[in-house]
From Swiss-Prot:
Domain ATP-grasp positions: 109-316
Subunit details: Monomer.
A single GO molecular function term of this UniProt record: phosphoribosylamine-glycine ligase activity
Protein name (database record): Phosphoribosylamine--glycine ligase
Record bears the keyword Metal-binding: yes
Organism: Salmonella typhimurium (strain LT2 / SGSC1412 / ATCC 700720)
Family to which the UniProt record says this protein belongs: Belongs to the GARS family.
Gene Ontology terms: biological process: 'de novo' IMP biosynthetic process; purine nucleobase biosynthetic process
Xref: PROSITE patterns: ATP_GRASP, GARS
EC number(s) per entry: 6.3.4.13
Catalysed conversion reaction: 5-phospho-beta-D-ribosylamine + glycine + ATP = N(1)-(5-phospho-beta-D-ribosyl)glycinamide + ADP + phosphate + H(+)
Native organism taxonomy: Bacteria, Pseudomonadati, Pseudomonadota, Gammaproteobacteria, Enterobacterales
InterPro entries: ATP-grasp (IPR011761), ATP_grasp_subdomain_1 (IPR013815), PreATP-grasp_dom_sf (IPR016185), PRibGlycinamid_synth_ATP-grasp (IPR020561), PRibGlycinamide_synth (IPR000115), PRibGlycinamide_synth_C-dom (IPR020560), PRibGlycinamide_synth_C_sf (IPR037123), PRibGlycinamide_synth_CS (IPR020559)
Amino-acid positions noted as binding ATP in the UniProt annotation, renumbered to this chain: 135-196
Length: 429
């Protein structure tokens, strides 16, 4: 069968790499893909942008694609799934209506409130004065979020009132996040430890994926501004069996049932970003309507199940007949980014020292890369690569991941040197 993966990031390289391992699959196309997918013998890039739905659809029809897997959020919120389904094509992802769970933070917070799903206390604002009054009433620390899609960067955790007021002005008057900031959500600052809880949903049944923990801040020790994610590991020890059960009962099931009841039946990957308090109670920080990036990379390295088989079952509403199998070992991925990220950075720099052959139990996934005409690999984004490895402990996986990237460099490249620190601290105690 033929599979199409939509996207060009590290997540899509990992999903396509995993899909190509399925015995059901003959060819995997990636639209538009990156240098990493271009260099994989089993994958084929197609030069179509992720939001060019007519071109994606006509390619899928022309090539008789049997299954499409959507990586990023942008095509989901503009209805790629609706278009493919209307044409009778199998596609794994939520409809435009269901993708509002990620596309609008205000929609999500109101949905959570309607269904009594645990989350931070909040209010939505479109005007500066009431927003500032609310800030002064609540005090800092406090969280300000742009309503729409801002590539994971539209969230300001303000530790002082001045910082909070500046963020409100910036988002509502200064238009720091384009259309995404015309409405903001202000919510209470939650204390605890974060985890990424990702499941597959077929509208009615749910199949949990491996848990993971992302590192959002750009700097070591979780300092500096938020990014799309600087590294991740799986499983996340903070998600104990008890926390897992609470998350399914209090968050995942009520969300799936609530969406169906409101006429937005949810199919696709559903990613709950959780904050887990000292008592092991999870609250929703955010929902994403797709697999996380960089969480996908370590999770796919651990996945023993056939990803394509699971996606097909989900498209047919038969996820209850499937289980997922995972490597017992831990997996850890470190993002190598371009100097200046998450601010402005240069592109087109040549990347040196990429591993020339496959490594056992490790893989360097490509994100912001492109292949030059002379086959040199160049940078094309802020997050460029993700060096990922398995290990019997998180500490061992960390050591192996960093070893994979020893020789990789380009002008200004950088990474955090402490990915996995929370889990390693637990292992040592």
């Amino acid at each position: 069968m033929k599979v199409l993966v939509i996207g060009n990031g590290g997540r899509e390289h990992a999903l396509a790499w995993k899909a190509a391992q399925s015995p059901l699959v003959d060819t995997v196309f990636v639209a538009p893909g990156n240098a990493g997918t271009a260099l994989e013998p089993a994958l084929q890039n197609v030069a179509i942008g992720v939001t060019d739905i007519p071109a994606l659809l006509s390619f899928a029809q022309h090539e008789k694609i049997d299954l499409t897997i959507v990586g990023p959020e942008a095509p989901l919120v503009i209805g790629v799934v609706d278009a493919f389904r209307a044409a009778g094509l199998k596609i794994f992802g939520p409809t435009e209506g269901a993708a509002q769970l990620e596309g609008s933070k205000a929609f999500t917070k109101d949905f959570l409130a309607r269904h009594q799903i645990p989350t931070a206390e909040y209010q939505n604002f479109t005007e500066i004065e009431p927003a500032l009054a609310y800030l002064r009433e609540k005090g800092a620390p406090i969280v300000i979020k742009a309503d729409g899609l801002a590539a994971g960067k539209g969230v300001i955790v303000a530790m002082t009132l001045e910082e909070a007021e500046a963020a409100v002005h910036d988002m509502l008057a200064g238009n720091a996040f384009g259309d995404a900031g015309h409405r903001i959500v202000i919510e209470e600052f939650l204390d605890g430890e974060e985890a990424s809880f990702i499941v597959m949903v077929d509208g009615e049944h749910v199949l949990p994926m491996a848990t993971s923990q992302d590192h959002k801040r750009v700097g070591n020790g979780d300092t500096g501004p938020n990014t799309g994610g600087m590294g991740a590991y799986s499983p996340a020890p903070v998600v104990t069996d008890e926390v897992h059960q609470r998350t399914m009962e209090r968050i995942i099931w009520p969300t799936v049932k609530g969406m169906a009841a409101e006429g937005n039946t949810y199919t696709g990957f559903l990613y709950a970003g959780l904050m887990i308090d000292k008592q092991g109670n999870p609250k929703v920080i955010e929902f994403n309507c797709r697999f996380g990036d960089p969480e996908t990379q370590p999770i796919m390295l651990r996945m023993k199940s056939d990803l394509v088989d699971l996606c097909l079952a989900a498209c047919d509403g038969k996820l209850d007949e499937k289980t997922s199998e995972w490597d017992e070992r831990a997996s850890l991925g470190v993002v190598i980014a371009a100097g200046g990220y998450p601010g402005s950075y240069s592109t087109g720099d040549e990347i040196h020292g990429l591993p020339l052959e496959e490594v056992a139990d490790g893989k360097v996934f490509h994100a912001g890369t492109k292949l030059a005409d002379d086959d040199r690999v160049l940078t094309s984004g802020g997050r460029v690569l993700c060096a990922t490895a398995l290990g019997h402990t998180v500490a061992e996986a960390q050591k192996r991941a960093y070893a994979l990237m020893t020789d990789i460099r380009w002008d200004g490249s950088f990474s955090r040197n402490d990915i996995g620190w929370r889990a390693i601290e637990r292992e040592q105690n």
